[in-house]
Amino acid sequence: MSHQSDLIETDIDAYLAQHEQKELLRFLTCGSVDDGKSTLIGRLLHDSKMIYEDQLEAVRNDNSKHGTTGDKVDLALLVDGLQAEREQGITIDVAYRYFSTAKRKFIIADTPGHEQYTRNMATGASTCDMAIILIDARHGVMTQTRRHSFIASLLGIKHLVIAINKMDLVDYSQETFESIKQAYGEVAKTLGQENLYFVPMSALDGDNVVNKSENMPWYTGESLMEILESVQITGAKNLKDFRYPVQYVNRPHLNFRGFCGTVASGEVKVGDEIRVLPSGKTSKVKEIVTYDGNLDKAFIDQAVTITLEDEIDISRGDMLVHAASDVQMSNRFKAHLVWMSETNMAPGKEYLFKFATKVTPGSVAAIDYRVDVNTFEHSSIEKMELNDIAVVELALDQQVVAESYQVNRGTGAFIVIDRLTNITVAAGMVIDVLEESSEAKSDFSAFEVELNALVRKHFPHWDAKDISKLL
């Protein structure tokens, strides 16, 4: 089978230009173990003619050694890249795949199904616009289905495709499809998910993946590919509120001072009056500079360099917003936290918190409750362990611009970094901005404060609390 475009062999520049203006859709696949995630992705790539002859030949050669589908070509081998994945027949790491059709470009995040890889799935879901949740038609809605749906909802994914797979093993039964559809509807109602698309399919045989199935004439809806090509996902992004975290101050010579970064949300035009946070100083946009020339307007996700009419002291970590924007800064937040480290988290330990380009020390002041991702029940805990998801209260040393993740992904997401190892130990989503603490302060002598600072600097593994915050 050949690639869908002959241009890639004859004129690579023309091929790239052809795809440059297409809209990009990022989606992830998730489901229980052996629901067919990797097979589905392999089928998407195969039927949309995005596989080269040598790739397909390699899969045929590996089929006898690692294949799990008998005489049929195991398309999952196209995407199960790690040797351990192939040998166990499961997905372990998040694998990103790229393909395109005549209408759209796609990035797929193939995420693990096992509960011990919850952190991997959360990572894959963080940049996606849509989730494909696979359900085995023989087993229906399972505990893992609820877990994946909860994580997708937590990460702000508004569009869910419920792919009821392996319909060939239940004789393409409409009754089975309707039963699972009703059962999942109850789960979605609990999570407040409304944009649902149900598709009966067989990824192994290709039914309703790219092409409509002749085995299920009772299904009159769209195939999976038709949904992927037509779904409108602009509503999931904040196109209104301009937020521009400064990543780098570019000063190549005395006559140029530009502020580099990526537009986190909204848009900005030349001449717009902007405000710099945290300083609060205002100016107007003079130029929007890119490698390909200046722009009149910059949109969400565009990487640009902005210059201002006035000389203002701006550094990495500052945020540019429209002057009229009502933006609240604080150093206390309520947030969902996904713990990704094998080292447990205890409230009060000091970490680095990274909001966009802003990094500040801080700690988890309190754990409100842990969320059971399988049952959605809440429980009290004293510390967070690997793959735990909890609602916590953050106390930061410095004020930052942060908003609810459900309102603005660009300013509502953050990561937590261990100060000693520099390893990312958690990812979080802001739920609410809290008022600054007005708790009663403790009294410590200057010597005690100085000694505490010395201990925290030279013996960070002791996890000493910063008593200066209690003054």
Curated annotation (Swiss-Prot):
Its EC number is 2.7.7.4. GO terms for biological process: hydrogen sulfide biosynthetic process; sulfate assimilation. Residues 31-38 are annotated as: G1. The keyword Transferase applies. Residues 22-237 form the tr-type G domain. Residues 110-113 are annotated as: G3. Pathway: Sulfur metabolism; hydrogen sulfide biosynthesis; sulfite from sulfate: step 1/3. Belongs to the TRAFAC class translation factor GTPase superfamily. Classic translation factor GTPase family. CysN/NodQ subfamily. With CysD forms the ATP sulfurylase (ATPS) that catalyzes the adenylation of sulfate producing adenosine 5'-phosphosulfate (APS) and diphosphate, the first enzymatic step in sulfur assimilation pathway. APS synthesis involves the formation of a high-energy phosphoric-sulfuric acid anhydride bond driven by GTP hydrolysis by CysN coupled to ATP hydrolysis by CysD. This is Sulfate adenylyltransferase subunit 1. It comes from Saccharophagus degradans (strain 2-40 / ATCC 43961 / DSM 17024).
